[in-house]
Amino acid sequence: MAAAAEESGWRRVGFVGAGRMAEAIAQGLIQAGKVEAEHVLASAPSDRNLCRFRAMGCQTTHSNLEVLHSCSLVFFATKPHILPAVLVEVAPAVTAEHILVSVAAGVSLSTLEKLLPPMARVLRVSPNLPCIVQEGAMVMARGCCAGSYEAQLLRSLLEACGQCEEVPEAQVDVHTGLSGSGVAFVCAFSEALAEGAIKMGMPSGLAHRIAAQTLLGTAKVLLQKGQHPAQLRTDVCTPGGTTIYGLHVLEQGGLRATAMSAVEAATCRARELSRNPSPVVAQVPSVLQALQGEGALAHREHSSVARS
């Protein structure tokens, strides 16, 4: 792993923010052997989330700047409204050697680049929680200074956490609504399926296990056979059988329209966040300009030494 890291041009992976999404990505990378746990450094204001990183064998700190000084590949996994202030804080430590990845929903590449030095190589990723079991569904988009090398490196790493595809940035917010928020939508549906079985007399634990396995198996069939869901649905239905009766009730309840509206609402919220970034963005014109100039250059040598 160490040799591969040297060849790829990075040695340590950093996480600014240590919440569930950061943990999911870190755990996926570690379990897949993409990075050793001791080469992961995570920062957070308190120990509440950092303790989970320590349990994985990772290094932790309360200093965001330490992450930038120690790691050339850094994931920013803070809450969206906090991220702009964090970027202003760490901007002096950013060099041309860094690859910076944001997983914050609704924070556009233009906002990220506005808060970082001009040469910063920035990418935006929309992950989802199943990354923690290496079954995530992710998309990524590049900033203006990130090229094919950065995109290929990030994709090769994130594929350890599941499926990762590069898309135009306009589709990232749609992915947030479909897959990021979709995890909760699918859980709600799985819960409802199980509760239907419980109502009909099946024990609760068994009902929830079977519901989850049904979703898992169905997803595998769709992916492995490349079928459209409508085709598989038709294959399951028999004239006058149980399935068509159940589907009729789902149609009466507006399942399709409700699911479509849920994705639309979540996507619109992500776009709203993109259009209305934190007030911090408008509060840093002259200060940020100074940070992007001599401040970043002054830290370049220090960053190189810290990573060696």
Curated annotation (Swiss-Prot):
<dbReference type="Pfam" id="PF14748">
    <property type="entry name" value="P5CR_dimer"/>
</dbReference>
<dbReference type="InterPro" id="IPR029036">
    <property type="entry name" value="P5CR_dimer"/>
</dbReference>
<dbReference type="InterPro" id="IPR036291">
    <property type="entry name" value="NAD(P)-bd_dom_sf"/>
</dbReference>
<comment type="similarity">
    <text>Belongs to the pyrroline-5-carboxylate reductase family.</text>
</comment>
<comment type="function">
    <text>Oxidoreductase that catalyzes the last step in proline biosynthesis, which corresponds to the reduction of pyrroline-5-carboxylate (P5C) to L-proline using NAD(P)H. Proline is synthesized from either glutamate or ornithine; both are converted to P5C, and then to proline via pyrroline-5-carboxylate reductases (PYCRs). PYCR3 is exclusively linked to the biosynthesis of proline from ornithine.</text>
</comment>
<keyword id="KW-0641">Proline biosynthesis</keyword>
<keyword id="KW-0963">Cytoplasm</keyword>
<dbReference type="InterPro" id="IPR028939">
    <property type="entry name" value="P5C_Rdtase_cat_N"/>
</dbReference>
<protein>
    <recommendedName>
        <fullName>Pyrroline-5-carboxylate reductase 3</fullName>
        <ecNumber>1.5.1.2</ecNumber>
    </recommendedName>
</protein>
<dbReference type="Pfam" id="PF03807">
    <property type="entry name" value="F420_oxidored"/>
</dbReference>
<keyword id="KW-0028">Amino-acid biosynthesis</keyword>
<dbReference type="InterPro" id="IPR053790">
    <property type="entry name" value="P5CR-like_CS"/>
</dbReference>
<keyword id="KW-0521">NADP</keyword>
<dbReference type="InterPro" id="IPR000304">
    <property type="entry name" value="Pyrroline-COOH_reductase"/>
</dbReference>
<comment type="pathway">
    <text>Amino-acid biosynthesis; L-proline biosynthesis; L-proline from L-glutamate 5-semialdehyde: step 1/1.</text>
</comment>
<dbReference type="GO" id="GO:0055129">
    <property type="term" value="P:L-proline biosynthetic process"/>
</dbReference>
<comment type="subunit">
    <text>Homodecamer; composed of 5 homodimers.</text>
</comment>
<dbReference type="GO" id="GO:0005829">
    <property type="term" value="C:cytosol"/>
</dbReference>
<keyword id="KW-0560">Oxidoreductase</keyword>
<dbReference type="InterPro" id="IPR008927">
    <property type="entry name" value="6-PGluconate_DH-like_C_sf"/>
</dbReference>
<dbReference type="GO" id="GO:0004735">
    <property type="term" value="F:pyrroline-5-carboxylate reductase activity"/>
</dbReference>
